[in-house]
């Protein structure tokens, strides 16, 4: 374990549907891969890329969310999730939405961290919320988490339906984490800009650690085959440019959508109205329809309150904006 980041230094991140203390139940192995990203920032895309490298092809031994579970998510008993991971003989790769300061940093483990323009992530989260079966999520959560351990009732009623514009205003102005003892506040709706930039910031200050690597949604869009070579190098997996080009065809959004029941998260849990809609469009710039000129100005003022210029350049444009290797 990296002595610079012992277990006692972790921030506790407990929200309505996730608890990073669940990681304490898992014994990490030499060669494990942990993939961390804010919601709707390319985590599933990255899982697919890593799966293509680990299995050297498109076939999986089961649904991706079983092979590579979101360990923190409180809709499956942690004993069941750990038993599945302990039984795996291949190189393990595990999903989390926990910021890096909420994880144990282990020198034997590779940490693959992913970013996306926060505005695009928020739009994608807005559509994902509409695709989610909240009643099913509530049933699963309450079956796993004892009443006295629940942070708050999941999916509490907002009192009135909010427009996308209202959602985005709340997202932009939401509180800065972490409050004492808890990493994220009890959020409603699509979360907050502050949470996204906080999570990316926990990676940014650790990006020069030898086992931490940053990837970006925009870079995937620009050159998917080229980006597939980057995790191959980070993870020590041999792959030629030609092989990466062959494998990348299975990680396009169209290809993943065509196998949504296998690739989308939680498909075996029945939480989506449509598995295919999880891979909605995957584009950039849809946020512009929700932002007035005044909100554009407020957004730029807000992000400069929350993060330094180099991180903001990378967060919005990937390596074209700023190379995190610098």
Swiss-Prot record:
User: Which residues are recorded as binding 3'-phosphoadenylyl sulfate?
Assistant: 40-45, 116-124
Q: Keyword Transferase, does the record have it? A: yes
Q: Which domain of life is it from?
A: Bacteria
List keywords of the entry alphabetically. Transferase
Q: What is its EC number?
A: 2.8.2.-
MF GO annotations: sulfotransferase activity
Which Pfam family, any one, appears in the UniProt record? Sulfotransfer_1
Tell me the active site.
97
What general EC class does the enzyme of this chain belong to?
transferase
Return the InterPro entries for the record.
P-loop_NTPase, Sulfotransferase_dom
**Role noted for this protein:** Involved in the synthesis of cell wall sulfolipids with activity towards mycobacterial trehalose glycolipids and eukaryotic glycolipids such as glucosylceramide and galactosylceramide (type I and II) but not towards eukaryotic 3'-sulfate galactosylceramide.
Question: Could you say which protein family the record assigns here?
Answer: Belongs to the sulfotransferase 1 family.
The protein here is known as: Glycolipid sulfotransferase MT1418
- List the source organism: Mycobacterium tuberculosis (strain CDC 1551 / Oshkosh)
């Amino acid at each position: 374990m990296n002595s610079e980041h012992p277990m006692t230094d972790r921030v506790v991140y407990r929200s309505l549907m996730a608890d990073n203390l669940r990681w304490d139940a898992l014994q990490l192995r030499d060669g494990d891969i942990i993939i961390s990203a804010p919601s709707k920032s390319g985590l599933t895309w990255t899982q697919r890329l890593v799966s293509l490298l680990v299995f050297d092809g498109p076939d999986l031994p089961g649904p991706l969310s079983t092979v590579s579970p979101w360990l923190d998510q409180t809709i499956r008993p942690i004993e069941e999730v750990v038993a599945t991971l302990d039984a795996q003989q291949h190189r393990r790769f595990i999903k989390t939405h926990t910021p890096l300061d909420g994880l144990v940093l282990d020198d034997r483990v590779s940490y693959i961290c992913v970013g996306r323009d926060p505005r695009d992530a928020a739009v994608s989260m807005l559509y994902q919320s509409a695709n989610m079966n909240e009643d099913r999520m509530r049933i699963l959560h309450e079956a796993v988490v004892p009443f006295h351990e629940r942070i708050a009732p999941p999916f509490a009623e907002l009192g009135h339906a909010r427009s996308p514009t209202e959602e985005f205003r709340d997202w932009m102005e939401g509180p800065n984490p972490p409050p004492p003892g808890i990493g994220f506040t009890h959020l409603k709706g699509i979360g907050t800009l502050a949470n996204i930039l906080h999570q990316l910031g926990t990676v940014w200050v650790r990006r020069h650690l030898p086992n931490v690597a940053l990837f970006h949604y925009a870079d995937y869009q620009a050159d998917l085959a080229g980006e597939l070579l980057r995790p191959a190098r980070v993870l020590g997996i041999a792959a030629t440019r030609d092989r990466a080009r062959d494998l990348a065809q299975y990680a396009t959004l169209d290809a993943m959508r065509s196998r949504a029941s296998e690739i989308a998260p939680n498909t075996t849990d029945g939480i989506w109205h449509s598995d295919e809609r999880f891979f909605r469009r995957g584009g950039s710039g849809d946020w512009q329809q929700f932002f007035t000129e005044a909100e554009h100005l407020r957004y730029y003022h807000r992000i400069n309150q929350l993060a330094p210029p180099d991180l903001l350049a990378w967060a919005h444009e990937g390596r074209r904006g700023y190379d995190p290797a610098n």
